[in-house]
UniProtKB/Swiss-Prot annotation:
Gene Ontology CC terms, in alphabetical order: cytoplasm
Protein name as annotated: DNA replication and repair protein RecF
Binding residues for ATP: G35, D36, N37, G38, S39, G40, K41, T42
Source organism phylogeny: Bacteria, Pseudomonadati, Pseudomonadota, Alphaproteobacteria, Hyphomicrobiales
Keyword annotations of the record: ATP-binding, Cytoplasm, DNA damage, DNA repair, DNA replication, DNA-binding, Nucleotide-binding, SOS response
Gene that encodes the chain: recF
Length: 376
């Protein structure tokens, strides 16, 4: 399958993290950013991650992203992108002060209402050291990871998830106040059923596609294969018609009103799902694998999902890989770079030592980052 390339040709930051002003002029090649810890390498990756909907790879409070000491009250990011819909100039940042801070987006200089429109132009995926504990951490971290995987294939998923959370909070509030008004609750629960099943089915379908791709690559991959499954909501029933599932979940919510009121929360729904990952070759739960095996599993999973995104959209995603080479031996590093290059997209990688990326050769542009300054 022919994969089209999406690439950034220019990135410009103002009052973003430790950068008063910074600019990168890029070609289509991969980008390697090296420098000491704390110099601002990850901040550059975070800036690129803001070219996708959401709060970036750190899930930052937007007001915290503005440079300390900045005269203005916000930050701005500009990027020229050869994207899925041709060349586009993207500008994003925040406006407002104090309590009311909102993200703004311009495409080719024209304001747009929703940052979701970014997915018409590029898909951005990332892997950071903060994700290394994914398999041993909380189920909420794994759900967030799962939903980001879905989002790259189904851009409407994030909106449905936030609408579901909003409806669920409304139901919880009514129940906590003892207001069992059937008209109010029936309306909210109908909305929750439609949104919740839509979320659950989107996760189920994405995971099915990802499992098929991983199984097709098993045995000839540089990184171990993962076996994936979901549990916690409508297990083994998500292949049924959505209308039947909505009726079933709606009934579940109605029957659980008094129980949920006593618990102080909604006990059934897509917000209770967990992602289970096993090391396929060892038939072992990921959380029981060594730290090195967990990292290799996660790298393999993210690369497989990047390939799936390319297959499904026809465009390779932009990959952000923070400290990606730090815990890999030389052979596995070289294999990783070959896999990344074979995806056909542009990736941004960080590390403390440029020598760790030598296997990339001419396939990458190298930049040195030093406390707010960037040199080629």
């Amino acid at each position: 399958m022919m994969t089209n390339k999406v690439s950034l040709s220019r990135l410009k930051l103002t009052d973003f993290r430790n950068y008063a002003a910074a600019a990168l002029v890029l070609d289509e090649r991969h980008v390697v950013l090296t420098g000491d810890n704390g110099s601002g390498k990850t901040n550059l990756l975070e800036a690129v991650s803001f070219l996708s909907p959401g709060r970036g790879l750190r899930r930052a409070v937007l007001s915290d992203v503005t440079r300390v000491g900045a005269e203005a009250t916000g930050f701005s990011i500009f990027a020229d992108v050869d994207g899925m819909d041709g060349e586009v100039a993207i500008g994003t940042g925040i406006e407002g002060d104090g309590e009311v801070v909102s993200r703004r987006l311009r495409l080719n200089g024209t304001p747009v209402k929703s940052v979701d429109e970014l997915t018409d132009h590029l898909r951005v995926l990332w892997l950071t050291p903060a994700m290394d504990g994914l398999f041993t951490g909380s189920s909420s971290d794994r759900r967030r990871f799962l939903d980001r995987l879905v989002l790259s294939l189904d851009p409407g998923h994030g909106r449905r998830a936030s609408d579901f959370e909003k409806a669920m909070r409304g139901r919880n509030r009514l129940l906590s106040e003892g207001r069992f008004d059937p008209v109010w609750l029936d309306g909210i629960e109908k909305q929750m059923a439609e949104l919740g099943i839509s979320m659950a089915v989107a996760r189920y379908e994405m995971l099915g596609l990802l499992k098929t791709l991983i199984e097709g690559r098993a045995g000839n991959a540089a990184f171990p294969s993962a076996t994936l499954s979901l549990a916690g909501f409508m297990d083994d029933r998500l292949n049924r018609p959505a209308v039947d599932l909505e009726d079933e979940y709606g009934l579940m919510l109605r029957d659980g009103r008094y129980r949920d009121a006593a618990a102080g929360r909604t006990l059934d729904g897509p917000h209770r799902v967990d992602l289970f990952v096993r090391h396929a070759e060892k038939n072992m739960e990921a959380e029981r694998c060594s730290t090195g095996e967990q990292k290799a599993l996660l790298v393999g999973l993210v690369l497989a999902h990047a390939q799936l995104t390319a297959n499904m959209t026809g465009y390779a995603p932009v990959l952000l890989l923070d400290e990606i080479a730090a815990h890999l031996d030389e052979g596995r590093r070289a294999a990783l770079f070959d896999l990344i290059h074979a995806l056909g997209g542009q990736s941004f990688m960080t590390g403390t030592d440029a020598a760790m990326f030598s296997a990339l050769g001419e396939r990458a542009q190298f930049f040195n980052v030093s406390h707010g300054g960037i040199t080629a």
